[in-house]
A protein has these predicted regions:
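Amphipathic alpha-helical segments
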Residues: 1-18, 109-121
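Beta-strand/loop substructures that line and gate deep hydrophobic ligand-binding cavities in soluble
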Residues: 34-59
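Short, solvent-exposed secondary-structure boundary motifs
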Residues: 3-10, 22-30, 79-80
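Solvent-exposed, well-ordered amphipathic alpha-helical segments
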Residues: 2-3, 7, 38-42, 95-96, ...
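Amphipathic, interaction-prone secondary-structure segments
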Residues: 13, 17-43
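Intrinsically disordered, low-complexity regulatory regions enriched in serine/threonine/proline
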Residues: 53-122
Length: 122
């Protein structure tokens, strides 16, 4: 039950992992969004997060017109949902109590996209 085995599992799925204090941050290669995995003893919280650079990143994609940004965001969220299923199994198998909080992050990201689309289309 080493955290290194968890990191190895995440990396094997194509993600980059950063460790800071009691937290692992799983980065996505397409968008500046990430999963934060926060440890507190035998409890762990997994949440979908992003930083301020996401707004500018989405604005640039929308203005370039080169991608369907909504589809891209949904794909990234879907990939993180799949990874979270693997994380859930790993944590349960290793005796952790897990609290998954992806929905809040999903809603925040989709609201950000809607705001940007309203501004750029209006």
């Amino acid at each position: 039950m080493s955290i290194q085995s968890l990191v190895d599992m995440i990396v094997s799925k194509g993600y980059q992992v950063q460790g800071v204090g009691n937290k692992l941050r799983v980065l996505h290669h397409l968008l500046p969004v990430y999963l934060d995995i926060v440890f507190s003893g035998s409890r762990v919280v997994v949440k979908l997060s992003f930083d301020n650079s996401l707004r500018e990143f989405i604005e640039d994609l929308v203005l370039s017109g080169s991608e369907d940004v909504g589809d891209l965001i949904e794909d990234v969220i879907g990939e993180f949902n799949e990874l979270t299923a693997s994380l859930y199994k790993w944590f349960k198998d290793n005796g952790f109590e897990i609290n998954i909080k992806l929905k809040e992050g999903e809603i925040d990201i989709m609201e950000l996209l809607e705001d940007i689309l309203e501004i750029t289309e209006g």
